[in-house]
C-alpha cells in the first residue's frame, strides 16, 4: 500500500511547462474573483469552482446536485465536480502566457544562473529580457558575433548594412529561450573542462562557476530552457483566500492582486497580438507582463516593489516562504497543537517531585475525550453524545471519572522560552481548586520560573506510546541532572537552603548544651518540649546494625543535624566508614549551604539513582521550608551593622589619594598613572571595608546567614548594604575615580545616587540586547548541529584527540579529570612510573578512573572524541562517551546535536555583553562574553588581532628608534621577522623557544590563520579552549563534548583544489566523507585522486552548507537555497530532525529511529508470567 507519508527522500527540481499543465485542473482566463452580489466565484476566474472544486461540500455551482449521494458526478450544466470543498486546498490551475517570460530567481539571483550558463553578464541579460537591446541569435554570413548586444540604433544600421534576412536578432525572454534551447550541455561541459586546465586567476574562477551550473543541469536532468516560463501555475484558492468583512468589503490575499495583474496584462497582450499591433506597443506589453510575473514570484527583487493600499509592498510567493512569518518557520516548524492550555503558575510546596497541580476546569476540558469514553465504559452514559452533554453541563459524577482518568496519565508542562530540554517536563497531574497551575518548587531552576506572574503551558500526550515516553523519559523526578555539565539541576534554593543551613548550625552556650541522650528519639522529644535548643551541642547514644552485628556508641552532634540527617542516606561517602570510630557518625556533620547541598544530591544520584534522590529531595524541601519558618529569619536595618573601621579606612585612603595628586601636579607621574593608582587605591579600600564588615557580622546575623548559605544575596551585595558602594562606571564604561563612600544603610546623597543610575540603566539595556543575541546564537547552533544523532555503537576509528588541562596563564580553567571522565581512551594509558596499564583502550572511564590517571602524574591523554569519529551521519556512542543527563553511557538515537546547541546557548544570557578595557591606552579592546563566543563560532576575524608566529624557533628581539622587531630563528637558521606596533603588549621574552601558531603579542588570533599554520587539529583545539575560557570566566560549566559536536560540524567540509580524475569540481565545498569516498573509487580504478584542504566554516555558513535543502531553506536565505537546490535537482535524504518535522514525519531520533520503528512484536501470551512484571515505583 502506498502511503503519502511513507517515503525516504525528497527531490526538488525545475518544473517543465508540460509538468505544470499536468498539475493543473484548468486554465484561469479571467482576472475576476468573486461576484460581489451572489458571493459565488466567477467562471474561469481566480476562484473558479470548475477548476478548483466546489466552495461547499457536495454541492455544485448551479445547485443542480446537492448532498453526498452525488459524490464524484460532474455537473452537466456548470461543469463542477461534486466533492468535498477541501480539494480547493490542493487543486491547481495555470495561466498560458502569450509570450514566454524569465523566472526572476534564476536570472536575478547571485550568481545569475541564467547569465552563467549563457556566458552573458547579468546586466546584458537584463537589457535583453526587459526589451532594451537586441541579442544576435544567428549572425549567418555577417561579421556580427553570436550573443552580441545591439541597441535599437545599431540594429537598424545593421539591417540597412547587411539586408533584412542576413542575420537573426531578437529581444525579450523569447530570444533568451532560443539561446538556452541551443545549449548542448555535454559539449559545454567538455569544453569548459578543457579551458579550466589552461586558465588562471579571475578567468579560472568564472569558468569554475559556469562549470558548476552546467554540471548541475547535466546531472539533474533539468533543461536550461525551463528557466524561461511559458505557463504559470496558479496555487489553490484556499491558500490565497478571500474573506468578506462586516460591511460588505472583501479582504484578500496579496497573491490574488499579483495574479490579477498577470492575467490582465496577458489578456491584453493576446488581444494586441491578434490585432497585429505595432511592434513597439507589443514589446511594451511584453515587458509589463515580464514585470508582473517577476512581482508575483519575488516582489521587490528587481526595481521598485508593487505596492498595495497605504504603500505597503505586496507579499509575493517568495515572501510566503521567507522569514519568521514565512511558511517554513511559522507553519511547518512551529505548529499550534490541540489538547493544550496555559495558566498562571503558583508554588506547590506540598507536591511530590513528580506531581503538578492542574486546575479542575482545565483538566476537564483537556481530558474531555478520555472522560467521555470512561463515562460510557462505566455505564454512566449510554453513548458518546450523552457523555459529551454530561461533560459540557459539568454534572457531579464527571469529577470522579476525571480523577480516575487523570490518575495515571502524565501531562507535559512547558515554560517559554524553552532554552534547553528541561524546559518541557512531564508530571503526574493532581486536581486543584482555583485556576492556577501548581508547580513543584524544585523544578523552578530548570524552567527558570518564579511566581511573580509567570505562565506555563500544559500539553496532553495522547497515544499510549507518548504517555510511556513522557513517564519514563521526561518525568521531572528522572531529570535531576543538567544535560550541559551533568551537575544536579534540582538543587534546593532560597528558603529550603536557609532552613537546611539553620538546622545544621551550632551555637555555644545555649539551652541543653552538653546533655547526653539515650537515643535520637529522646533528642527530638526534648527539642519539642523546648528542653534543648536546636543548635545545642549534645551527645547522643546511637545503635546501628552493620553486616549483622549491632554497634553502639556515643556521638557529638546537635538536634538540628539529627533532624536533617533523617532525610539523607547514610552512605554517601562524606565519612570514611572503614575507621571504627566513624561508623556511627552522621553522614552530614557539617554546615549545609547551597553548594554542599548540590554535592549531597550529586552523590546520592550517583550512588542510589533518580528515584531515591527525588524522595530525598522532597524530604529536604519539606524540612527546609519548615525550619526556615520556625527559625523566623528576617531582615531589618538593625542587621546592617556599619563596621567601626570604615571611617578610619576612608580617611587614610583620602590622604594617600592627596599624595598621588601632589605627585601628579609636580609632574612625577603621568595622567594615566595617576588615574590607575587612584582606582587601585579605592578598589583596595572597598575590599578592606567589605572584609571589616564580614568580620564584624555575627554568624547568626540573618543577612550573613542568607548570603553565606547561598539562599539569597552575595558578599558584594552585603558590602553595598552596610559597607560602601565603591567605584562606579560612567556610561561609556570607564570607571569614575570618585567612589560612592556611603552604603545603602547610611543613604546616598544626590550626586552618588545620580552616578548609580548610569550602571543600572546600562545593565537594563544590556540585558534586553543580550536576550535577543543569545536567542539568535542558539538558533544558529541548533541549525548547524541538528542532524547529529548517535547512530551506531562504534565507528571503529583508531584515531584519538589529545587532551590536557586548559590553562589561562597560571590559572587552571578546566582540570584533566573533568576532560577525561565519561570518555574512552583511544590507546592504553600507562603509568609512567610503574609501567602498569591503568586503563585499556576503548574502556569506559568514570570519574574515579579519571582521578587515578590524573594522580599518576599523566598530563596528556588521547581519548576517543567526536572530533575523530568516523560515522558518516551523526556520531557513534564510543566517541561521544557519557550522556551528561543520566551519567550513563549514551544510547543510540540520542539527539546529541540539539542537546549540544542547547547547552551552549542556554547560558548565553548569563554572559556579559560589554567589551573589557585592558589597562593602558594602546591595549586593544579584548572582546569577551557573548560577542566573543559568537565571533569564535562564526570563525570571524577578531578585533585586536595578535601577531602569530608562522614558524617554530627561538625568539630574538631588536629595538630601533622607529620600531620594535621580533625575529624568530628556526632550527635551520632561517629568520622570520615581525614588526611590532608600539602599544601592543609582547608575550614572549628574548631567547624563548616558541612553536608555529604561538602568539607573539597579546590579543585574539584569527582562527583561519591557525588552520593554515597548525592544521585542522590546531584550530579545533583553539576554538574549544577559547569558548571554554569565556564560559568558565562567568562561572558556567559546559562539558567539552557539546563544543566538540558543534566544532566538528564547522570543520566537515573540504575545499577542492585539484579535481584529479574525479567528477568533483575545483573550488567547490564537499563533505569530508564524500571526498574520501570519491577518492577511494578513483584509486580503485587506478586514476588520479582529488586534492583538497579542510575549510573552516562559521556556524551560519555550515548550517547553509548542509546536505538537506529543507533544513537550509528553513534557516536563512530561503530563495537562494531553493534556487540552488532546484537547479541541482537535489535529493534531501531526510536524515536530520528539522526536515522530518517539516514534512510531518517522526524525527529519526530516540524511539523515532527506523531501528526502533521496524520492531515486530510477537504476542505469545503463554511465555509472559505475571510475577516477572517488575513493579515500577515512581
UniProtKB/Swiss-Prot annotation:
Binds 1 Mg(2+) ion per subunit. Mg(2+) binds at residues 450, 452, 454. Zn(2+) 2 binds at residues 795, 869, 876, 879. It catalyses: RNA(n) + a ribonucleoside 5'-triphosphate = RNA(n+1) + diphosphate. Pfam families: RNA_pol_Rpb1_1, RNA_pol_Rpb1_2, RNA_pol_Rpb1_3, RNA_pol_Rpb1_4, RNA_pol_Rpb1_5. One of its GO terms (cellular component) is DNA-directed RNA polymerase complex. SMART domains: RPOLA_N. Its cofactor is Mg(2+); Zn(2+). One of its GO terms (biological process) is DNA-templated transcription. It comes from the Bacteria. Zn(2+) 1 binds at residues 60, 62, 75, 78. GO terms for molecular function: DNA binding; DNA-directed RNA polymerase activity; magnesium ion binding; zinc ion binding. InterPro entries: DNA-dir_RpoC_beta_prime, DNA-dir_RpoC_beta_prime_bact, RNA_pol_asu, RNA_pol_N, RNA_pol_Rpb1_1, RNA_pol_Rpb1_3, RNA_pol_Rpb1_3_sf, RNA_pol_Rpb1_4. Keywords: DNA-directed RNA polymerase, Magnesium, Metal-binding, Nucleotidyltransferase, Transcription, Transferase, Zinc. Its EC number is 2.7.7.6. PANTHER family: DNA-DIRECTED RNA POLYMERASE, DNA-DIRECTED RNA POLYMERASE SUBUNIT BETA. Belongs to the RNA polymerase beta' chain family. DNA-dependent RNA polymerase catalyzes the transcription of DNA into RNA using the four ribonucleoside triphosphates as substrates. HAMAP family: RNApol_bact_RpoC (MF_01322). The RNAP catalytic core consists of 2 alpha, 1 beta, 1 beta' and 1 omega subunit. When a sigma factor is associated with the core the holoenzyme is formed, which can initiate transcription. This is DNA-directed RNA polymerase subunit beta'. The lineage of its organism: Bacteria, Bacillati, Bacillota, Clostridia, Eubacteriales. The gene is rpoC.
Amino acid at each position: 500500500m502506498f502511503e503519502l507519508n511513507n517515503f525516504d527522500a525528497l527531490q526538488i527540481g525545475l518544473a517543465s511547462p508540460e509538468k505544470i499543465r499536468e498539475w493543473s485542473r484548468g486554465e484561469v482566463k479571467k482576472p475576476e474573483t468573486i461576484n460581489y452580489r451572489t458571493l459565488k466565484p466567477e467562471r474561469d476566474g481566480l476562484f473558479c469552482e470548475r477548476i478548483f472544486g466546489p466552495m461547499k461540500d457536495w454541492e455544485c455551482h448551479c445547485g443542480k446536485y446537492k448532498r453526498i449521494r452525488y459524490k464524484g458526478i460532474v455537473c452537466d450544466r456548470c461543469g463542477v465536480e461534486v466533492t468535498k470543498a477541501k480539494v480547493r486546498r490542493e487543486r491547481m490551475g495555470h495561466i498560458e502566457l502569450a509570450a514566454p517570460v524569465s523566472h526572476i530567481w534564476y536570472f536575478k539571483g547571485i550568481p545569475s544562473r541564467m547569465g552563467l550558463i549563457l556566458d552573458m553578464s547579468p546586466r546584458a541579460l537584463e537589457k535583453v529580457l526587459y526589451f532594451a537591446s537586441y541579442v544576435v541569435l544567428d549572425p549567418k554570413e555577417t561579421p556580427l558575433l553570436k550573443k552580441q548586444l545591439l541597441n535599437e540604433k545599431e540594429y537598424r544600421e545593421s539591417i540597412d548594412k547587411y539586408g533584412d534576412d542576413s542575420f537573426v536578432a531578437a529581444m525579450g525572454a523569447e530570444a533568451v529561450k532560443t539561446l538556452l534551447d541551443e545549449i548542448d550541455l555535454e559539449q559545454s561541459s567538455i569544453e569548459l573542462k578543457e579551458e579550466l586546465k589552461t586558465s588562471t586567476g579571475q578567468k579560472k574562477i568564472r569558468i569554475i562557476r559556469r562549470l558548476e551550473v552546467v554540471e548541475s543541469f547535466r546531472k539533474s536532468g533539468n533543461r536550461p530552457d525551463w528557466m524561461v516560463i511559458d505557463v504559470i501555475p496558479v496555487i489553490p484558492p484556499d491558500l490565497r483566500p478571500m474573506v468578506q468583512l462586516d460591511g460588505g468589503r472583501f479582504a484578500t490575499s496579496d497573491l490574488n492582486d499579483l495574479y490579477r495583474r498577470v492575467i490582465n496584462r496577458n489578456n491584453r497582450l493576446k488581444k494586441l497580438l491578434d490585432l497585429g499591433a505595432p511592434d513597439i506597443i507589443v514589446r511594451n506589453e511584453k515587458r509589463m507582463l515580464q514585470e508582473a510575473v517577476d512581482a508575483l514570484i519575488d516582489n521587490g527583487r528587481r526595481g521598485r516593489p508593487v505596492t498595495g493600499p497605504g504603500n505597503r509592498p505586496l507579499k509575493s510567493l517568495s515572501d510566503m516562504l521567507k522569514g519568521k512569518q514565512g511558511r517554513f518557520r511559522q507553519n511547518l516548524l512551529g505548529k499550534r497543537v490541540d489538547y493544550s492550555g496555559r495558566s498562571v503558575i503558583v508554588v506547590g510546596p506540598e507536591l511530590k517531585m513528580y506531581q503538578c497541580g492542574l486546575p479542575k476546569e482545565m483538566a476537564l476540558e483537556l481530558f474531555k475525550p478520555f472522560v467521555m469514553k470512561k463515562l460510557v465504559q462505566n455505564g454512566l452514559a449510554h453513548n458518546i453524545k450523552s457523555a459529551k452533554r454530561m461533560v459540557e453541563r459539568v454534572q457531579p459524577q464527571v469529577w470522579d471519572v476525571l480523577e480516575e482518568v487523570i490518575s495515571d496519565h502524565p501531562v507535559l508542562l512547558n515554560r517559554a522560552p524553552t532554552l534547553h530540554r528541561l524546559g518541557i517536563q512531564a508530571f503526574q497531574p493532581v486536581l486543584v481548586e482555583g485556576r492556577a497551575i501548581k508547580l513543584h518548587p524544585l523544578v523552578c531552576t530548570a524552567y527558570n520560573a518564579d511566581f511573580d506572574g509567570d505562565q506555563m503551558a500544559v500539553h496532553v500526550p495522547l497515544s499510549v506510546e507518548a504517555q510511556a515516553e513522557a513517564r519514563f523519559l521526561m518525568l521531572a523526578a528522572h531529570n535531576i541532572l543538567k544535560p550541559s555539565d551533568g551537575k544536579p539541576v534540582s538543587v534546593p534554593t532560597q528558603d529550603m537552603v536557609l532552613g537546611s543551613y539553620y538546622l545544621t548550625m551550632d551555637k555555644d552556650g545555649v539551652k541543653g548544651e552538653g546533655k547526653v541522650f539515650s537515643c535520637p528519639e529522646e533528642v527530638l522529644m526534648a527539642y519539642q518540649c523546648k528542653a534543648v535548643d536546636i543548635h545545642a551541642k549534645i551527645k547522643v547514644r546511637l545503635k546501628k546494625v552493620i553486616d549483622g552485628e549491632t554497634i553502639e556508641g556515643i556521638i557529638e552532634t546537635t538536634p538540628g543535624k539529627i533532624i536533617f540527617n533523617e532525610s539523607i542516606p547514610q552512605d554517601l561517602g562524606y565519612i570514611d566508614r572503614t575507621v571504627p570510630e566513624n561508623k556511627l557518625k552522621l553522614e552530614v556533620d557539617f554546615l549545609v549551604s547551597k553548594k554542599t547541598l548540590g554535592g549531597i544530591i550529586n552523590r546520592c544520584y550517583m550512588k542510589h539513582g533518580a528515584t531515591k534522590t527525588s524522595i530525598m529531595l522532597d524530604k529536604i524541601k519539606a524540612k527546609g521550608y519548615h525550619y526556615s519558618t520556625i527559625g523566623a529569619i528576617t531582615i531589618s536595618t538593625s542587621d546592617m551593622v556599619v563596621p567601626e573601621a570604615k571611617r578610619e579606612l576612608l580617611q587614610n585612603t583620602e590622604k594617600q589619594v592627596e599624595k598621588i595628586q601632589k605627585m601628579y601636579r609636580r609632574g612625577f607621574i603621568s595622567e594615566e598613572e595617576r588615574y590607575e593608582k587612584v582606582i587601585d587605591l579605592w578598589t583596595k579600600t572597598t575590599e578592606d571595608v567589605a572584609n571589616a564588615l564580614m568580620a564584624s557580622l555575627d554568624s547568626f546575623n540573618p543577612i550573613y546567614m542568607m548570603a553565606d548559605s547561598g539562599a539569597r544575596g552575595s558578599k558584594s551585595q552585603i558590602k553595598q548594604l552596610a559597607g560602601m558602594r565603591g567605584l562606579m562606571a560612567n556610561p561609556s564604561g570607564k570607571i569614575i575615580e570618585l567612589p560612592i563612600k556611603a552604603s545603602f544603610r547610611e543613604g546616598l546623597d544626590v550626586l552618588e545616587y545620580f552616578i548609580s543610575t548610569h550602571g543600572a540603566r546600562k545593565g537594563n539595556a544590556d540585558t534586553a540586547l543580550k536576550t535577543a543575541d543569545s536567542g539568535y546564537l542558539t538558533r544558529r547552533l541548533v541549525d548547524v548541529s541538528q542532524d547529529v544523532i548517535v547512530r551506531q555503537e562504534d565507528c571503529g576509528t583508531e584515531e584519538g584527540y589529545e587532551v590536557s588541562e586548559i590553562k589561562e596563564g597560571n590559572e587552571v580553567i578546566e582540570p584533566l579529570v573533568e576532560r577525561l571522565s565519561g570518555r574512552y581512551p583511544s590507546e592504553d594509558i600507562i603509568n609512567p612510573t610503574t609501567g602498569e596499564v591503568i586503563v585499556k583502550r576503548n574502556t569506559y572511564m568514570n570519574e574515579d578512573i579519571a582521578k587515578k590517571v590524573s594522580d599518576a602524574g599523566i598530563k596528556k591523554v588521547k581519548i576517543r572524541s567526536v572530533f575523530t569519529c568516523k560515522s558518516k551521519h551523526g556520531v557513534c556512542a564510543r566517541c561521544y562517551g557519557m550522556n551528561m543527563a543520566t551519567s550513563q553511557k549514551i544510547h543510540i538515537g540520542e539527539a546529541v546535536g540539539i542537546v549540544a546547541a542547547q547547552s551552549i546557548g542556554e547560558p548565553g544570557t548569563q554572559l556579559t555583553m560589554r567589551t573589557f578595557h585592558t589597562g593602558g591606552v594602546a591595549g586593544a579592546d579584548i572582546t569577551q562574553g557573548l560577542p566573543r563566543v559568537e565571533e569564535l563560532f562564526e570563525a570571524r576575524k577578531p578585533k585586536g588581532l595578535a601577531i602569530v608566529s608562522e614558524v617554530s624557533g627561538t625568539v630574538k628581539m631588536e629595538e630601533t628608534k622607529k620600531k620594535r622587531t621580533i625575529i624568530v630563528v628556526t632550527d635551520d637558521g632561517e629568520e622570520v621577522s615581525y614588526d611590532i606596533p608600539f602599544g601592543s603588549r609582547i608575550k614572549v621574552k628574548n631567547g624563548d623557544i616558541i612553536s608555529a601558531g604561538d602568539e607573539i603579542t597579546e590579543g585574539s588570533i584569527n582562527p583561519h590563520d591557525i588552520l593554515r599554520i597548525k592544521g585542522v587539529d590546531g584550530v579545533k583545539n583553539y576554538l574549544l579552549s577559547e569558548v571554554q575560557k569565556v564560559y568558565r570566566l562567568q562561572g558556567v560549566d559546559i562539558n567539552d563534548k557539546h563544543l566538540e559536536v558543534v566544532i566538528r560540524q564547522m570543520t566537515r567540509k573540504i575545499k577542492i583544489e585539484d579535481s584529479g580524475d574525479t567528477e568533483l569540481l575545483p573550488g567547490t565545498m564537499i563533505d569530508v566523507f564524500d571526498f574520501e569516498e570519491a577518492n577511494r573509487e578513483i584509486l580503485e580504478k587506478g586514476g588520479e585522486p582529488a586534492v583538497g584542504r579542510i575549510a573552516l566554516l562559521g556556524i551560519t555558513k555550515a548550517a547553509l552548507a548542509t546536505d538537506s535543502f529543507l533544513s537550509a531553506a528553513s534557516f536563512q536565505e530561503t530563495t537562494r537555497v531553493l534556487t540552488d537546490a532546484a537547479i541541482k535537482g537535489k535529493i534531501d535524504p531526510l536524515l536530520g530532525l528539522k526536515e522530518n518535522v517539516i514534512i510531518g514525519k517522526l524525527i529519526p531520533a530516540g524511539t523515532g529511529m527506523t531501528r526502533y520503528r521496524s520492531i515486530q512484536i510477537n504476542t505469545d501470551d503463554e511465555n509472559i508470567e505475571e510475577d516477572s512484571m517488575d513493579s515500577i515505583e515512581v
